[in-house]
């Protein structure tokens, strides 16, 4: 499929497509919305079946960032970048590619501000920052956003448990964390410290075992009986095939795009499974980076704002119950309202 076909019907503001001859990589920067402020979103580096798949990924994720920023009440719009590479580079070729990518982002004049994502570390962002001033999450900046993402997810799980059981206390509650990476691994430790019975699953069994928690084979995740299932790895795990097999009471995780399609929110409601909308739950990372690097917050104020994720969910759950809608629809209403309020009349 060609790039024009992929872009057809996209409701974003602009997309930048550049081929990097030296590395063979394609650079895609998608700015979905700047209505609430400059677009923010991470950069991922990945090998795709075809370059057009990388563009489609950037488009989809940039739209999700618009909703995440608005849902978190942050003064930013949504964007995303993808470096679609023939193979993951290392050493000096990687460094040169990242510097050229920084020049591309800098040429956009601050309309898009980037951070880390898949296969992009704080050290990589240091290199990007050599040629671009619009970089979050360097080693000298707000740091790895996984800390804020995990902490925000913890507050989200507390709010979810309170709605289900009447108390936010996690002691004795069973929680399955899917993904033991930079976010899931930290989250598992926080949950264990709070007294929860924590189960962890990861495609890398050694990484799951390193958390010190009870482990679950990846193929058994959906059917494992727990109070809360917390997807913190790949998206799209909730669909027409998996939802009927779920054995959890609620879902609250920070993986992006957990629902394979919007109708899956209705499927969860029909099963009596409480769903915390993913873009609300996962906003802690952007809150951390923007708050510490742009807004000048201290750690105490950052923690207050991360706790606000739980407050937002409590409001959404109450609205969903009162109006007999899904929490996902309640969250979408909130975002649409905030975007409409920001648009010039």
Where are these regions (language model features)?
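Adenosine-phosphate binding glycine-rich loop
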Residues: 161, 249-345
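Hydrophobic beta-strand scaffold residues
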Residues: 112, 198, 215, 274-275, ...
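Conserved dinucleotide-binding and phosphotransfer motif residues
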Residues: 108, 194, 271
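Flexible, glycine/charged-enriched surface loops at secondary-structure junctions
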Residues: 69-74, 111-116, 165-174, 320-332
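N-terminal ligand-binding/catalytic initiation module
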Residues: 1-140
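Glycine-rich phosphate/diphosphate-binding loop of Rossmann-like nucleotide-binding domains
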Residues: 144-230
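Rossmann-like adenosine-cofactor binding region
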Residues: 203-281
């Amino acid at each position: 499929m060609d790039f024009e076909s992929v872009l057809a019907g996209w409701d974003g503001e602009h997309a930048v497509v550049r081929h990097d001859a030296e590395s063979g990589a394609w650079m895609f920067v998608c700015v979905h919305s700047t209505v609430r402020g400059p677009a923010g979103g991470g950069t991922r580096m990945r090998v795709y079946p075809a370059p057009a798949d990388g563009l489609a990924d950037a488009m989809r994720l940039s739209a999700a960032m618009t909703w995440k920023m608005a849902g978190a009440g942050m003064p930013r719009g949504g964007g995303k970048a993808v470096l679609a590479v023939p193979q993951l580079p290392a050493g000096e070729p990687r460094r040169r590619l990242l510097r050229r990518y920084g020049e591309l982002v800098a040429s956009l004049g601050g309309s898009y501000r980037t951070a880390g994502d898949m296969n992009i570390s704080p050290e990589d962002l240091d290199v990007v920052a050599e040629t671009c001033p619009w970089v979050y999450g360097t080693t000298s900046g707000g740091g790895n956003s996984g800390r804020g993402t995990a902490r925000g997810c913890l507050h989200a799980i507390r709010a979810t448990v309170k709605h289900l059981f009447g108390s936010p206390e996690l002691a004795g509650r069973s929680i399955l964390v899917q993904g033991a990476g930079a976010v899931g691994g930290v989250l598992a430790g926080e949950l264990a410290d709070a007294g929860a019975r924590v189960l962890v699953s990861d495609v890398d069994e050694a990484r799951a075992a390193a958390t010190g928690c009870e482990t679950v084979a990846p193929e058994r995740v959906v059917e494992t009986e727990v109070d809360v299932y917390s997807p913190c790895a790949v998206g799209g795990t909730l669909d027409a095939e998996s939802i009927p097999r779920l054995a959890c009471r609620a879902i609250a995780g920070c993986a992006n795009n957990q629902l394979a399609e919007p109708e899956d929110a209705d499927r969860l409601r029909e099963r009596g499974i409480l769903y915390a909308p993913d873009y609300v739950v996962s906003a802690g990372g952007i809150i951390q980076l923007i708050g510490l690097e742009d807004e000048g917050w201290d750690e105490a104020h950052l923690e207050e704002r991360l706790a606000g994720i739980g407050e937002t969910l409590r409001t959404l759950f109450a609205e969903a119950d009162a109006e007999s809608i899904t929490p996902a629809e309640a969250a979408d209403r909130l975002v649409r309202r905030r975007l409409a309020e920001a648009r010039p009349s």
